[in-house]
Amino acid sequence: MIDDPLLLDACMHDAIELAQRGRFEVEPNPRVGCLLLRDGEVVARGYHEFYGGRHAEAMARAEAAQKGVRADTAVVTLEPCSSPQGQDGKKTPPCTEALLRAGIRRVVIGAVDPDPRHRRLGIQALTQAGVEVLEGVAARACEALYERFRRTVQLDRPWLLAKWAMTLDGKTAAPTGEARWISGPEARRRTHELRARCDGVMVGFKTAQIDDPELTVRLVSGKQPVRIVVDPLGEIDDDSNLVRTARQAPTWLLCSEEVDARRSGVLQDLGVQVIHVPTAEGPRRLHLQQAFRELRRRGLRRVLVEGGGGLVAQMFAWRCVDQVLAFVAPKIIGGRLSPTPVGGEGRPFMAEAWRLEEVQHETCGEDLQIAGFVT
């Protein structure tokens, strides 16, 4: 095993670069990178690739096993997790076990887990198993990597990703309300991939009424997310696709506490799970913070919001949007009656605009995909 602090620091910075490959895919989980070393030489690499996927340590261990190499040191940007699979919605086995099974004798850690529920438990599990733990290597760079994750831990709600498709002039539908299809097949396939990697997919009542969506994963293989409709008055049509298929795919309705028991009972008899939450600013607006906390309490950690503009505007007003993914199609619709992705009153001045950071642009078929985190 190596003791050169400069080499360990260089390895940790390499692990940080690896961790960044999970950007936009792993949230609300932290981005993590891992290097496995033998006698000072890197023999395997891993990173947390996407939400619900294997963690960095497991990926690195698999690569080492494939090569038939046994490492002695792990360099990892964040304290390895130790909680069992299934606890608090955890989708993967503990990384401490992966490292112990790999025969690792030393673990070099950049940052301690900022989540108070898990902080230092991974370190404790490793040291109790006789593994040497070295903390604080490239600590400042690793702490910076987890600034957003630290805020996420404190939110007590799911990670909320707002996604929309719009024309070049910023419209999400024609003046008639017709919106199929703005984006091309590649963007639609990517949307289905994203649905499969989320715990829930949410729309507002108007989108459910006008578009009559299914909100299921169809173009790719993957698990079906919980389908959620924000419907304060419980007005969703009993013959809508979402209600008709509620027994085939989980469907939740967020409505106000004022929706009577008879209406709630009708929906529940049709297979819809009705969740009552308090209102804010009148009966047609739910207290979104309370609604999202309830979703988190029920085990949802990552929710994709697919509109419409009214719901997304309310979420921005409540400061509840964490990430944005927009597909911009090379089409122009025009018309002052054509809806936009974010409705409401808007921001009064450009200086007050909601801004994105870590912005990423890439082509997706004929469309442009823009992703970023809301500041």
What are these regions (language model features)?
Residues M1-E27, A44-R45, A64, G68, ...:
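Enzymes that bind and transform nitrogen-containing heteroaromatic metabolites
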Residues Q20, E79, I104, I109-V112, ...:
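A broad detector of the eukaryotic-type serine/threonine protein kinase catalytic domain
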Residues F24-V26, G53, I123, V137-A165:
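Proteins enriched for Cys/Gly/acidic motifs involved in redox and nucleic-acid/cofactor modification
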Residues G33:
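Helix-turn-helix
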Residues L36-A141, V226, W252, E257-V259, ...:
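Zn2+-dependent cytidine deaminase-like catalytic core
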Residues G40, F50, R54, F149-T152, ...:
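Generic signature of intrinsically disordered, low-complexity segments enriched in small/polar residues
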Residues Y47, V75, Y146-F149, F327:
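Aromatic side chains
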